[in-house]
């Protein structure tokens, strides 16, 4: 019985992880839950899974939870705020922490879990993108396992099992192409929020679905793959694979190519991250190659997806620039979802922030450097959006 904690328990990753726990109660026990603001759903999860410790960032939701669980025959530890989430992450009884918090908000809780000796099922890619220079040395120092729980990096990790050190030559990340893969570039100026959050294959949260539509999600995954698997950026490629059946591939030194296939279901990589190195039997629908039909691939359109190249450039620059890229993207997507900027303004604002930060880059950033870069980039994007609202071109900002 593995004891686990779930950060972001009311989001897409968290609820799918709890689906796994519900299906395999003899394999997993929930010790801790944390979320940002969905007190009603969190209360339901407390009733069902009976965790020892719980945190919600939004303190105003605490009474909702207390009222909902007042009749229970036990009392979990209830915490609030970001500090509460950190306490849940490091809570003593848990063996593995699923990091399902969206964005850079997951960085500090993940660091706390690593320092407490917890293995990490990493579904929060921003932790490595922004904090890789800090997180990876901590993983080595504390001897914990960092296991990818997103589909692409789980696929790479699975393909690498049994590959000797030095055997990896190239990584090929597959991308669905997102909501607008079949739209002409000229139509992107008319994109609405409702258009952008309709993913053709995957069921995900709003922010990551927009990232998929811009292909920033794949660009961020390139940076994550660099940190996880140690390849340089010119050895990490992206291909559009509309069917989302092949989740990623690796090329070995002899040019052999290995791939991991499966239906687009996030439970598969989550289960593997929690059960590795074991394989747990499931009754989920097996892949039927005849039903799946043809597999197609094409090169991404760099003009249509400028965010992808911004991510490659930030990764190659290194230092705190990936943290700037990530924060600028988070803020720009948030503004788009609030209908304060247009879809095509997302990459413009990200590029603006990255360009402005060039002379402030630090080659070996500390945690404080990363957090400051994150704060700075968000402010720059907000200022840039305000200039856009006034009718000014952001290129003219000083």
Swiss-Prot record:
It is an enzyme of class 1 (oxidoreductase). Its EC number is 1.1.1.267. It catalyses: 2-C-methyl-D-erythritol 4-phosphate + NADP(+) = 1-deoxy-D-xylulose 5-phosphate + NADPH + H(+). The keyword Acetylation does not apply. Its cofactor is Mg(2+); Mn(2+). Pfam families: DXP_redisom_C, DXP_reductoisom, DXPR_C. InterPro entries: DXP_reductoisomerase, DXP_reductoisomerase_C, DXP_reductoisomerase_N, DXPR_C, DXPR_C_sf, NAD(P)-bd_dom_sf. GO terms for biological process: isopentenyl diphosphate biosynthetic process, methylerythritol 4-phosphate pathway involved in terpenoid biosynthetic process. One of its GO terms (molecular function) is NADPH binding. SUPFAM superfamilies: 1-deoxy-D-xylulose-5-phosphate reductoisomerase, C-terminal domain, Glyceraldehyde-3-phosphate dehydrogenase-like, C-terminal domain, NAD(P)-binding Rossmann-fold domains. Pathway: Isoprenoid biosynthesis; isopentenyl diphosphate biosynthesis via DXP pathway; isopentenyl diphosphate from 1-deoxy-D-xylulose 5-phosphate: step 1/6. NADPH binds at residues 10-13, 38, 124, 126, 205. Keywords: Isoprene biosynthesis, Manganese, Metal-binding, NADP, Oxidoreductase. 1-deoxy-D-xylulose 5-phosphate binds at residues 125, 151-152, 176, 199, 212, 217-218, 221. Mn(2+) binds at residues 150, 152, 221. Catalyzes the NADPH-dependent rearrangement and reduction of 1-deoxy-D-xylulose-5-phosphate (DXP) to 2-C-methyl-D-erythritol 4-phosphate (MEP). Belongs to the DXR family. PANTHER family: 1-DEOXY-D-XYLULOSE 5-PHOSPHATE REDUCTOISOMERASE (PTHR30525), 1-DEOXY-D-XYLULOSE 5-PHOSPHATE REDUCTOISOMERASE, CHLOROPLASTIC (PTHR30525:SF0). HAMAP family: DXP_reductoisom. This is 1-deoxy-D-xylulose 5-phosphate reductoisomerase. It comes from Rippkaea orientalis (strain PCC 8801 / RF-1) (Cyanothece sp. (strain PCC 8801)). The gene is dxr.
